[in-house]
């Protein structure tokens, strides 16, 4: 597939390095060399390869005239990175988080939640584990549309 035909925002401008893992290679005992791709060095808020997909999905949203991004996850690095790029692009961002273990979500004990607030998230909605996440995001989208977003 030729990815060049899809619009991008330019978040990824340089290839990330490969780093040798000699101790891991040695531990495997075979005559092999293991390397890791250092996508943790991509720009953003330490999200690794998620920046690559957001390079395309944010371009798509902006090209469609979006002023608001809604995404979902579980104590989510994806949510954090989406929020960071949305803020950089001047878009509002709302998050829907799935609480997979009942009564486990504690915003004061979450590094990601601290960053959500620091980055200026518009809202964080926490739903029970097993929820229809697409449905939950659509409910939020309908509410925002009714408010003129």
Label each PLM-derived region with a short phrase:
Residues 1-149:
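PLP-dependent amino-acid enzyme catalytic core
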């Amino acid at each position: 597939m030729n990815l060049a035909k899809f619009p991008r925002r330019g978040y990824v401008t340089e290839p990330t390095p490969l780093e040798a893992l000699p101790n891991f290679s040695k531990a495997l005992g075979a005559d092999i060399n293991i390397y890791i791709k250092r996508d943790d060095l991509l720009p953003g808020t330490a999200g690794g390869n998620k920046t690559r997909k957001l390079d395309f999905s944010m371009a798509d949203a902006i090209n469609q005239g979006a002023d608001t991004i809604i995404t979902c996850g579980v104590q989510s690095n994806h949510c954090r990175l989406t929020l960071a790029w949305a803020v950089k692009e001047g878009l509002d961002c709302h998050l829907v988080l799935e609480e997979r273990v009942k009564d486990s979500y504690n915003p004061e004990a979450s590094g990601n939640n601290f960053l959500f607030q620091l980055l200026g998230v518009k809202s964080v909605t926490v739903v029970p584990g097993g929820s229809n996440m697409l449905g939950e995001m659509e409910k939020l989208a309908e509410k925002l549309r009714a408010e003129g977003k």
